[in-house]
Amino acid sequence: MVDIIHRIGIKASPTEVYAALSTVDGVAGWWTRETTGESKVGGVITVRFLDHGVDRQGPVTEKGRMDLEVIRLEPGKEVRWRVKAGPQEWINTDVTFSLSPADGRTVLVFGHRNWREAVESTAHCSMKWATFLLSLRELVETGSGRPAPDDMKIDNWN
């Protein structure tokens, strides 16, 4: 099994960071604006990534979609999702956000765990997760993140 792991500091309390991770509106503020569902244990959150065409002209097409079952919500400490639908290599992987206070900020340890193997898309997703974690930090620290479709583009896949 392969894991993607990142660590980031955020100038906010664990409670504030948790709010951005544990609600549909919070996730829509840093990952993708196209976020729907129920943010409760046993609920499913759906995230969609849309292509609006060159310069936002032309037809809108769906580039990606994931259904995430909410496995754990521990206020101020942890959020855990299990991928139930999406790209084949994502199915049954776990996405984890562990929060702890440190030196007047929150340290977030992120994991996208249990990939069956390291493939090219693992590298792409690792880099994209890093950009979305920076978006999360911007959202919590400034009130405005960079969710898709306004996220940082890193390669020809997005």
Residue ranges, per PLM feature:
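Terminal, regulation- and interaction-focused segments at domain boundaries
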Residues: M1-P14
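Short beta-edge strand/loop motif at the mouth of beta-sheet-based domains
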Residues: I5, E16, D25-R65, P149-D151, ...
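Hydrophobic/aromatic beta-strand elements that line small-molecule binding cavities or substrate pockets
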Residues: H6-I8, M66-R72, T93-S100
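A short, structured loop/turn motif at beta-sheet edges
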Residues: P14-T15, E38-S39, I71-K77, S98-V107
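Hydrophobic pocket/interface hotspot
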Residues: V17-L21, V27, I45, V70, ...
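Helix-adjacent hinge/juxtasegments
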Residues: V54-P75, V79-A85
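Beta-strand/loop substructures that line and gate deep hydrophobic ligand-binding cavities in soluble
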Residues: K84-L136, P147
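A short N-terminal helical cap/helix-turn-helix that marks the beginning
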Residues: G143-G145
